[in-house]
Amino acid sequence: MARLCFLEKIKLNTIEFNMNEISIVTAFFDIGRGDWTPQKGLPHYLQRTTDTYFDRFANMAKLDNTIIVYTSEDLAEKVWSIRKNKEHKTVVITVDFEDQFIEQRDSIRKVQNNPEYLAKINPSQVKNPEYWSADYVLVNMLKSHFVNHAIGAGVVDTDLVAWLDFGYCREASTLNDVELWQYPFDKDRIHFFNIKNFNPETSITSIIANNDVHVTGPCIVASQKMWPELERLVEESFKELISKDLIDDDQTLLLMSSLKEPEKFELHPISADDWFIAFRKYNENLS
């Protein structure tokens, strides 16, 4: 897969790094989840409207950290409105998501439409979007790309950078009353949060077929120098799956990345029932 480039670089004034402060990169594109309804034969928990996502983002937006948001032009003003009075710590970069990443989207869709691929999937899992929504798989695959673009564009003002899903703070309590997120993550490692250790006897095909989550995707932390390493490994893992007529969302791509070069990663064990713990367990600034 060719390295993804889609935006002109943006250069801001260089700001001296603040030791353990963490810049946040996130993204939101409307891929139609508001229409993923039981009436269409889909599980009720898949449906999330644009308003649902922005309500959740409003919780995270209370942070004083720099937040860089990739979104569509029609939603940019909504982001600015939510970050009112924090504009100096906010960057919004607009992307025409539907018209970008055509090659990658087509590769994903080709696998998802392959009857041989679908036949491998556990029937109890087949309605989950990673098995049928190319946009869902694509936007999750691009997490490390968006972070690296932000770093290259000069809009990240700390050494530590986190990807946080746009809806990470599902409840206000997820933020844990934190105002400025800081934590001394090891800057020589890529930090994942895993709910299950990998068993070498388990095949990647089985993991995909059964939606067998090991590494979670909503929060990833690394220093600026380590994010290109993650993007490289994710791209390699994506190419590997496509070559085998397989596809999955970021959780399997992250697992595969950590297995390729484990020395570059630190896995932080978390409960399968409690994914959203960054501000409670990995934070040194409780207000």
Role assignments for model-derived ranges:
Residues 17-51:
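N-proximal low-complexity "stem/linker" segments adjacent to membrane-targeting elements
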Residues 55-64:
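Short, acidic, metal-binding catalytic loop of nucleotide-sugar glycosyltransferases
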Residues 76-88, 106-108:
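Short, aromatic/basic amphipathic alpha-helical patches
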Residues 90-150:
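Active-site-proximal specificity loops/subdomain of glycosyltransferases
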Residues 135, 139-193:
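GT-A fold catalytic core of metal-dependent nucleotide-sugar glycosyltransferases
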Residues 168-170, 192, 212-287:
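Catalytic core and acceptor-binding pocket of nucleotide-sugar-dependent glycosyltransferases
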Residues 192-200:
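Short beta-strand-to-loop element that shapes/binds the nucleotide-sugar donor at the catalytic cleft/hinge
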